[in-house]
Each structure stands twice: as structure tokens, then as C-alpha cells.
Amino acid sequence: MLRIARVSHNAVKMASSRGIHFSSDGFIKMKDQKHILKVMNSPENQWSTDELLSHSDHSSDEITSETLQKVSKKLAPIFKSAALPMPDSDETMFSLIKTLRTQVNLVSHIHDIDVSGVAPLTCLTPIKDFTYEQLTAEDSGEPGPEVLWDALSCAEKKDGRFFVVSRDIKQEEPTQ
């Protein structure tokens, strides 16, 4: 079993629909644990970082001065938009290319993972702490205390349900 610390309410609903349930001690219980263990232990679903790093070390021998110049030209706009200085030496650029190749190799291995039957991620929400009682309680439909705060109560000027912002900002003339 897998112990969890925090989980979003939507994740609990999605997990419950897929046969994953949470026990009172914070452990996840799955209906079909044998299938999950079989998938996790199959050789085609396993690879190690040593394997990935050793593969990328062999490909680093192929970097020529021509490749170095081409990559430098392609990376220049990326460095500029990120407000980073270009590497000042060929050794630094060589190291950067080696790191990028390792990362691309990792991404290609991740793309090879079978994700059939996995729902795509539709949104990212902040993770909140939940107790077991909150996770198992029925939703009453009443808004929680964080929803009851009226943001307009702090506004100096308002028009209906909108803030009013005055345009009385004076522009200072530049002094020389």
C-alpha cells in the first residue's frame, strides 16, 4: 500500500471512480493490486537513470565543431529571451549540449510509457490538506468559510458589484 500526505478533493473523486480508495490511516487501497504490481514489475515498464545516462554518454562523442556552432545559433534566442548569458567557452557549450541530450533522452523514454486508460490532465489546482473525515463526508453544497468573504467590502468606491478606480493620477514631468 502507498501512504499519502496530501491530496486534492478532485483527485479523491477521480481515484474513487477508478477503484482507488483511501483508508483512515492515509493509505491508498486499490481493488486490483495484482494487476498494478504486474504492470509495475514488467521489464518493458522499467528503465534506470544509469541506462539513460550511459546512452547519452555514447551520443556525446558525436559533437563536432560544426554541430557546436549550429546549436549555439539555435540556443542564442533562447538564452536572450531568458536573459541569460551565452556560454563563454566551447567546453561550457559542450557540457550544455551533453545535458540537453540527456534530458531529451529522458523525455523520449517518458513518451514511450503506455498511458492507455489514463485520463489526461485538464487543470492544475492547488493542493490542500484534507483529513479523512473531510474526504469521506458528503458534500452539503454550502459554501465554505473562505467563500463567504466579500471582496467588495474593502473597496472605497464601488458601483454595483464592481470596484471604481479613479483616474486622478498626476504624471510627473521628467527632470533633467
UniProtKB/Swiss-Prot annotation:
Cystine pairings recorded for this chain: none
EC primary class: ligase
Biological processes annotated in GO: glutaminyl-tRNAGln biosynthesis via transamidation; mitochondrial translation
A Pfam family: GatF
Gene Ontology CC terms: glutamyl-tRNA(Gln) amidotransferase complex; mitochondrial inner membrane
Primary location class: mitochondrion
GO molecular function: ATP binding; glutaminyl-tRNA synthase (glutamine-hydrolyzing) activity
UniProtKB keywords: ATP-binding, Ligase, Membrane, Mitochondrion, Mitochondrion inner membrane, Nucleotide-binding, Protein biosynthesis
Reactions the enzyme catalyzes: L-glutamyl-tRNA(Gln) + L-glutamine + ATP + H2O = L-glutaminyl-tRNA(Gln) + L-glutamate + ADP + phosphate + H(+)
Record membrane topology: Peripheral membrane protein
EC number(s) reported in the record: 6.3.5.-
Compartment annotation: Mitochondrion inner membrane
Family classification: Belongs to the GatF family.
Quaternary structure (record): Subunit of the heterotrimeric GatFAB amidotransferase (AdT) complex, composed of A, B and F subunits.
Matching HAMAP family: GatF
Function: Allows the formation of correctly charged Gln-tRNA(Gln) through the transamidation of misacylated Glu-tRNA(Gln) in the mitochondria. The reaction takes place in the presence of glutamine and ATP through an activated gamma-phospho-Glu-tRNA(Gln). Required for proper protein synthesis within the mitochondrion.
Note in the entry: This protein may be expected to contain an N-terminal transit peptide but none has been predicted.
The protein's name in its UniProt record: Glutamyl-tRNA(Gln) amidotransferase subunit F, mitochondrial
Organism: Yarrowia lipolytica (strain CLIB 122 / E 150) (Yeast)
